[in-house]
């Protein structure tokens, strides 16, 4: 292993220890407060849209537009959670409610669509307040609801790197017989351990992470552990794994700042380091 690789491994190990210490201190200081704040925020993943054209708006058209800003939740029948509201006379009043899978999609949708023009009218998009209004009912007549063929693919959480040396597929002819741990990358902070994920959410995150890693080099396998907030990726060789750590560490993935390190590096740590790391790795979010 050359000097640059040794320096990179040392730097990544230092970053990992600093991050683990920071997170341990954060947990001790305000874990309960953060969990409460997150639970309050995560309850509201809906937007309320008003000012929609009463003669042109359809559920299908609305979901096709707003799925661009995040994955829309679906009901048991697989239909997107989009409600069109009517007044006391049964006429569409120009208001709608859309529920996303993730809270950050609400912020993006508001930023992109509030006071924008939709079907020739300026609309207002805001975070839903869930206040019951007299006379409001879901616009649920069968002949008013059109079949929705599914949202567009969600926005990719990992984009191809543009900086020098990133985003290129690395094909090393490595004939060394490397231990699996030395070519295994552990991604911490992939999942928020205080958040509930559906199976579809987990599959989407795994697919996006795999896509990002395959842009760097050949991947043998990938697995995720939402309860620990981690993902494990096994590469073809150690050089690709090191390059992955260099590229991915510090990158934001689904709103989470990634920490990537070689699994085999932990075997070189002292016993005290292992004990300290094991206390807090399960607390990474």
Swiss-Prot record:
Biased composition (Basic and acidic residues): 135-149
GO biological process, one term: mRNA splicing, via spliceosome
Skewed-composition ranges (Acidic residues): 276-285
Region of interest called Disordered, as start-end residue ranges on this chain: 135-154, 265-285
Domain of life of the organism encoding this protein: Eukaryota
Modified residues (Phosphoserine): 163
GO molecular function, one term: U2 snRNA binding
Keywords: mRNA processing, mRNA splicing, Phosphoprotein, Repeat, RNA-binding, Spliceosome
Family: Belongs to the HTATSF1 family.
Function statement: U2 snRNP protein which helps to refold U2 into a structure favorable for its binding to SF3b and SF3a prior to spliceosome assembly. Mediates functional interactions between U2 RNA and PRP5. Enforces ATP dependence during formation of the prespliceosome by brokering an interaction between PRP5 and the U2 snRNP that depends on correct U2 RNA structure.
Subunit details: Interacts with PRP11. Associates with the U2 snRNA.
Other comment: Present with 1360 molecules/cell in log phase SD medium.
Protein name (record): Cold sensitive U2 snRNA suppressor 2
Organism: Saccharomyces cerevisiae (strain ATCC 204508 / S288c) (Baker's yeast)
């Amino acid at each position: 292993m050359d000097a640059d690789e040794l320096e990179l491994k040392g730097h990544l190990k230092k970053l990992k220890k600093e991050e683990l210490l920071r997170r341990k201190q954060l947990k001790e200081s305000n874990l309960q407060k953060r969990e409460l704040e997150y639970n309050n925020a995560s309850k509201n993943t809906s937007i309320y849209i008003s000012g929609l054209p009463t003669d042109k708006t359809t559920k299908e058209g609305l979901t096709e537009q707003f799925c661009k800003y995040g994955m829309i939740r679906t009901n048991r029948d697989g239909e997107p959670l989009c409600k069109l509201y009517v007044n006391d006379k049964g006429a569409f009043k120009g208001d709608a409610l859309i529920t996303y899978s993730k809270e950050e999609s609400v912020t993006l949708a508001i930023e992109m669509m509030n006071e924008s023009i939709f079907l020739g009218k300026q609309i207002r998009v805001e975070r839903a307040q869930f206040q019951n209004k007299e006379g409001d009912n879901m616009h649920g007549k069968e002949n008013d609801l059109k079949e929705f063929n599914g949202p567009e693919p969600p926005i990719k959480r990992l984009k191809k790197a543009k900086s020098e040396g990133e985003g290129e597929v690395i094909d090393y002819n490595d004939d060394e017989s490397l231990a699996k741990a030395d070519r295994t990358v552990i991604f911490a902070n992939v999942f928020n351990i205080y958040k509930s994920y559906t199976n579809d959410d987990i599959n989407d995150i795994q697919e996006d992470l795999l896509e990002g890693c395959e842009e760097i080099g050949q991947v043998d396998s990938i697995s995720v552990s939402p309860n620990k907030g981690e993902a494990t990726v096994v590469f073809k060789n150690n050089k690709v794994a090191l390059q992955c750590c260099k590229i991915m560490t510090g990158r934001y993935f689904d709103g989470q700042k990634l920490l990537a390190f070689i699994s085999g590096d932990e075997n070189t740590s002292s016993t005290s380091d292992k004990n300290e790391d094991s206390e807090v790795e399960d607390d990474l979010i």
